[in-house]
UniProtKB/Swiss-Prot annotation:
Keywords: Electron transport, Heme, Iron, Metal-binding, Photosynthesis, Signal, Thylakoid, Transport. Binds 1 heme c group covalently per subunit. This is Cytochrome c6. Monomer. Residues 1-25 form the signal peptide. PROSITE patterns: CYTC. It comes from the Bacteria. Heme c binds at residues 39, 42-43, 83. InterPro entries: Cyt_c-like_dom, Cyt_c-like_dom_sf, Cyt_C6, Cyt_C_IC. Functions as an electron carrier between membrane-bound cytochrome b6-f and photosystem I in oxygenic photosynthesis. It comes from Thermosynechococcus vestitus (strain NIES-2133 / IAM M-273 / BP-1). Belongs to the cytochrome c family. PetJ subfamily. One of its GO terms (cellular component) is plasma membrane-derived thylakoid lumen. It is found in: Cellular thylakoid lumen. The gene is petJ.
Length: 112
């Protein structure tokens, strides 16, 4: 009985691990699309045309306490200063996807 339970758990974990990259890729692809249509005008290539020091580059996100999905989601939902709020314009899923995309790009240095 114990062996069977361990086998079932091992199979379940293997399935979850194998599915994660595909799900993440789909989120990043949607995040890229949402970013392109809603964010790129001000944040092309991870920059910031309004406030040059507050970019989406990893170092700036870390410096300003924004290097987490939760922080980016809050900022996108509520806006700040010249950045408009996107809650109501974008779905929660779109906002989550764009946050994941921003973090992914920041980790890659916005190299693509």
């Amino acid at each position: 009985m114990k062996k069977r339970f361990i086998s079932v758990c091992a199979i379940a974990i293997a399935l979850l691990v194998s599915l994660t990259p595909a799900a993440l890729a789909a989120d990043l692809a949607n995040g890229a699309k949402v970013f392109s249509g809603n964010c790129a005008a001000c944040h092309m290539g991870g920059g910031n045309v309004v406030m040059a020091n507050k970019t989406l580059k990893k170092e700036a996100l870390e410096q300003f306490g924004m290097y987490s999905e939760d922080a980016i989601i809050y900022q996108v939902q509520h806006g700040k200063n010249a950045m408009p709020a996107f809650a109501g314009r974008l779905t929660d899923e779109q906002i989550q996807d764009v946050a994941a995309y921003v973090l992914d790009q920041a980790a890659k240095g916005w190299a693509g």
